[in-house]
Amino acid sequence: TLPTQRFSRSDETDGPGTFFGGYRTIAEHYSHLDAIAANHPTLAKLVDYGDSWRKLNSKPNGYDLKAICITKIRPNSSDCALNPNVDKPRFLLMAAIHARELSTSEMAWRWIDYLIDNYNVDTEVTMLLDSTEVWVIPMVNPDGRQIVEQNNISPYLQRKNANTSQGNCQNPPGITYQHGVDLNR
């Protein structure tokens, strides 16, 4: 069982890189992934696994799609490689597939930190990371999330990505009228 932890968001709310009372922006999430990989090279590897719809179509505000692989990385191994032939089993957590699901990316952030901070501290975390690749994608839909982030007071209710190939809909997006493709259809 995981120990009970208390998290205080008082120092994080409405700070730089946040919106709507403390949710972190895409830029803040990507900076976090960069820092984890840079500060823990034997436990984490940042992977660019593709491009968002906007970036693929040369639209403004397009993003690289980023994942972080967390495991005890062995020298000269296939750990965290982008191929199916690896030695360790893999677990994949995808968060924020729908742009307006703000809390899922926050939970992914905390889980990444929990795994990194508790390696060689908690025996279960150590055993997990010694034997398994844990892949986390904290922001599956950055194009859609960027639309949500545009209104700091009350986030737009964009659910889909930012694909406009089917024509434009309501701007700002409402709960039922919005452009894009639902990524888990």
What kind of region is each of these model predictions?
Residues T1-R185:
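M14 metallocarboxypeptidase catalytic domain recognition
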